[in-house]
Amino acid sequence: MYIGRFLVVGKTKEGKPFAAYRVSSRSFPNREAKKMDDNTVAIIPKDLNEMFKNPYITYNCIKVIDKTIVVSNGTHTDFIAEKLHFGKRDALAYVLAVMDYEKDDYKTPRIAAILDENECYMGYVAHDDIRVKKVELKDGKGYYLGVYNACKIDENQIIDIKGETAEEIADYILNYEEFEHPVACAVAVIDKDGIKIATKGK
């Protein structure tokens, strides 16, 4: 199944909260997830000239602010992070409503999530819908939210999670066979001694 770019929020079997983001693409496969610093992961093209072909292929996909993780499929990552003082729900709702879906040929939804060790909110804005919802994370499970054929937040979109470290989860989600055309993956895990980030590419 092809669901395009997607995020996963959940907990490891040992109960560590995490957020993951995977680029799945048929149109722009030559991209990588690059750790820019201890708090930021960016999606960038391997050929920087491609940045000028499409405004939606280069962006920060994970941003860590103190003990909170923001994950999304576009430039709204940074704006959500800036609005965290609104609270998780309102930061998502405000930024998604203001920025709206991507104005490309596919009317691609913007998807996002915010989580810390205590709670998680997921949200999206599509051309015909907008939603923000608090979800209860379960050990060993992850909610996924994709831009194509999977842009909804419900119990039917839960997958098993394998791995305890950011590296293990990134490898698992990048190679998750049900979702086609993997390109790159980034993961942030909330551990007892801080938030750990890892990236993986094809």
Swiss-Prot record:
InterPro entries: IMP_cyclohydrolase (IPR010191), IMP_cyclohydrolase-like (IPR020600), IMP_cyclohydrolase-like_sf (IPR036795). Fully active at 80 degrees Celsius. Gradually loses some activity from 90 to 100 degrees Celsius. It catalyses: IMP + H2O = 5-formamido-1-(5-phospho-D-ribosyl)imidazole-4-carboxamide. Its EC number is 3.5.4.10. The keyword Transmembrane helix does not apply. One of its GO terms (molecular function) is IMP cyclohydrolase activity. One of its GO terms (biological process) is 'de novo' IMP biosynthetic process. Pfam families: IMP_cyclohyd. It comes from the Archaea. Optimum pH is 6-8.5. Keywords: Hydrolase, Purine biosynthesis. Transmembrane segments: none annotated. Pathway: Purine metabolism; IMP biosynthesis via de novo pathway; IMP from 5-formamido-1-(5-phospho-D-ribosyl)imidazole-4-carboxamide: step 1/1. Belongs to the archaeal IMP cyclohydrolase family. Catalyzes the cyclization of 5-formylamidoimidazole-4-carboxamide ribonucleotide to IMP. This is IMP cyclohydrolase.
